[in-house]
Structure formats: structure tokens, C-alpha cells
Amino acid sequence: MKSYQRQFIEFALSKQVLKFGEFTLKSGRKSPYFFNAGLFNTGRDLALLGRFYAEALVDSGIEFDLLFGPAYKGIPIATTTAVALAEHHDLDLPYCFNRKEAKDHGEGGNLVGSALQGRVMLVDDVITAGTAIRESMEIIQANGATLAGVLISLDRQERGRGEISAIQEVERDYNCKVISIITLKDLIAYLEEKPEMAEHLAAVKAYREEFGV
């Protein structure tokens, strides 16, 4: 685990974005941890979040021309990541996002920001069922652009309805790489460093045994 990944876990814990306990997910599964990126909700949170996304992007080595944030959660993520890339990595890249509802006046279409072209890096909070990615792919392809990769904050590394995860499905269906700031494996490595969290470590490991990929 790299230092920025450890810092991201501590940041998420401090904001209660990441919690350990017992939570029922939308899928009905009982999970020993919960991640709610919506709680990164102040200016400082967003500034820090952008730095972590930018760090993971640069670390990945994936080449891309533009950041795309799917509405709605992806919009602030794309914006803050673009700022962080410019301020901390000297990479001044365009960004773009979509509207959920098409405008009938003013600037046309359902896209805001730079023209959607070239190699696109899609940024979002998490991938649960992959629906937002599929909708975004339609927009990207309709504009003649290509998907360079997808970056999310957390990869839960767990099976969907079948034997593979929603993330593995996206990688298979769109022949692209999905990267994340942290994974379930990183969470477990972090818990292993904290003796006072042994109870949570056991629960998360048991969950991975049952649902992990």
C-alpha cells in the first residue's frame, strides 16, 4: 500500500465516509463496512479528494486526453481532479460532464465543459452495478471518443450477481482498465496494521471469503 492510499483511508475514516460495523447494502448483503463518498461535502474535503484522485491517475500511468464526470456525483470529482492535476502535477487537462436532462435553450446538448473527444478518463465515486458507466459509454461513443479508463475511489472487490464483480464486468465489456484509489485488499492491509481494529479485521476477512473475487 502506498502512502497516499493509507492517507486516503485515514481521510475517509476521519470524515465518516468509511465506517466499520454492520450495514445492509442495497443488494441485501450484510457488510462489515460502508463507504459513502457523499460525505466528502466541504471545500476542503473536495480539494483533498481531488489530490487523491490525481495521485491515483498519475500512479496508474494510463494516458488520456480528457476527464469525464458522469452526472451527478462524477461532476465535482472531475472538476476537483482537473484542478489537482493542474496544481500538483503540472497537467492542464480539459474536463467535461453530462446533464441528466437536455437543455432546450442556450448552449445546446447535454454536455458541459470541453468537447468530448480523444481518450477519455471517466471518474466517479464507486461502481455498484455499472449502470452509470454503461450510460456514460453511450455518450462517449456517440461523440466519437474512446474510453481510456475508469477511476473510482474504492473497489470493493466483491462478486455481483454472477461470479465476477461489476468492475470486472465493465473491464470485460468495454476492454478498459478500472483503477481505484483503494481496494478491499488495501483496507485489509490497513486494518492489519491496527491491533485495536482486530474485531473489524476478522469481520472484513470473513466477508471477503464469502463474497470476494
Swiss-Prot record:
SUPFAM superfamilies: PRTase-like (SSF53271)
Class of the enzyme per the UniProt entry, highest EC level: transferase
GO terms classed as biological process: 'de novo' pyrimidine nucleobase biosynthetic process; 'de novo' UMP biosynthetic process; pyrimidine ribonucleoside biosynthetic process
Cofactor requirement: Mg(2+)
Transcription found in the keyword field: no
Subunit structure: Homodimer.
Role, per record: Catalyzes the transfer of a ribosyl phosphate group from 5-phosphoribose 1-diphosphate to orotate, leading to the formation of orotidine monophosphate (OMP).
The name this protein goes by in its record: Orotate phosphoribosyltransferase
Lineage: Bacteria, Pseudomonadati, Pseudomonadota, Gammaproteobacteria, Enterobacterales
Name of the coding gene: pyrE
